[in-house]
Amino acid sequence: MAALYTSNAQLFPTHSDIVSGTEAIQKFWQGVITSGVKGATLTILDVDGQGDIAYEVGKYALTGEGGKGLDNGKYIVVWKRVQGKWQLHRDIWNSSMPMSGH
């Protein structure tokens, strides 16, 4: 998964600190998989850019075992073209579900 990101990429996950660099990003996504996330659906709402930078705006839905809905929300990704290859450079998302206890 980390291979999709630039070498100095950053994640900005819901309810979490910034995750920086490919090693930390790989560890983060491995933790997501270990936590029970089995699938993700992304719905792209907008894409635009110029030169070697582009952005993508969309919605996501995460599912667990048996297709059980785990989370849904929205995201923005900044893409960067590095040596002719588009990679994720900044990846931010947040849940649309209410926080527990609220």
Please state what every model-predicted region is.
Residues 1-2, 9, 21, 25, ...:
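Hydrophobic pocket/interface hotspot
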Residues 3-7, 87, 99-102:
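Short, low-complexity N-terminal intrinsically disordered segments enriched in polar/charged residues
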Residues 72-97:
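Short beta-strand edge/turn micro-motifs at domain boundaries
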Residues 5, 60-62, 92-95:
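Short beta-strand segments enriched in hydrophobic/aromatic residues
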Residues 4, 9-20, 31-37:
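A short gly/proline-enriched turn/hairpin at secondary-structure junctions
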Residues 24-69:
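Surface-exposed, charged secondary-structure patches
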